[in-house]
Amino acid sequence: MAKRCAAGEGELQGNEEMISPAKKLCTSAVSGLRRIAVEGNIAAGKSTFLRLLKESSPAYHVISEPITKWQNVDSPGDSVTASQQCGGNLLDMFYREPKRWAYTFQTYACLSRLKAQLRQLPQEVASQPNSTIFFERSVHSDKLVFAENCHDSGLLSDVEWNIYCDWHSFLLESLPLHFDAFIYLKTTPQTTWERMQKRGRPEEQDVALDYLKSLHEKHEKWLLDSENKMK
């Protein structure tokens, strides 16, 4: 069972080959490799925390959140996807018309994250003994925090939520992603809202504090409730 640990609020500011099932998609099969997911609210300081970790040791490798895919921006080393060729900033579309785009965004966010987290590790990482790979969020928070919050707030219908849960469970059973631990960057909703305004990401300028409060409650329930189990 993966370990969970919470980090208190600090001063943080703001063509690769896919591994085939035959190679066991769970890359923790690499000897000595540890896989840790860093979780937290929007603007909790995850990117800064991960950058500091990466700079602190050559044994640390970071898989960042694929947000550029959601913004329709071609990031270095990635090919342009069919959705990008069609145009559209899906992150912005979700924030502007959440009920219309909730299912589309939550589906694509999870699938793009899954793709990023299943890429074959660089040789220098895979060959290094006792290395650790840190992930900016996981497919578990995609479901248990963001998608579930959309359902609870009425942005996802019962039918959409049931379909989401069905394919999400199937993918995790078919493409196992084991995590050895979860690090939770616990930050107050007010602080994350202030940081979000400060960093000035255009899509986030109208995000309400109440939305961050709801996400905070979901993180607390998932990561700090000892009775809760990942499904």
Regions found by a protein language model. Name each.
Residues 143-220:
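A glycine- and Lys/Arg-enriched "phosphate-lid" helix/loop adjacent to the NTP-binding pocket
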Residues 55-105, 148:
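Conserved substrate/cofactor phosphate-moiety recognition/catalytic segment
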Residues 1-34, 68, 74-76:
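Extreme N-terminal, non-catalytic leader segments
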Residues 41:
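P-loop (Walker A) phosphate-binding loop of NTP-binding proteins
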Residues 49-50, 54:
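Post-Walker A alpha-helix
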Residues 38:
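Hydrophobic anchor at the beta1->P-loop junction of P-loop NTPases
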Residues 97-178:
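Glycine-rich phosphate-binding loop used to anchor ATP phosphates in small-molecule kinases
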Residues 46:
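Conserved lysine of the Walker
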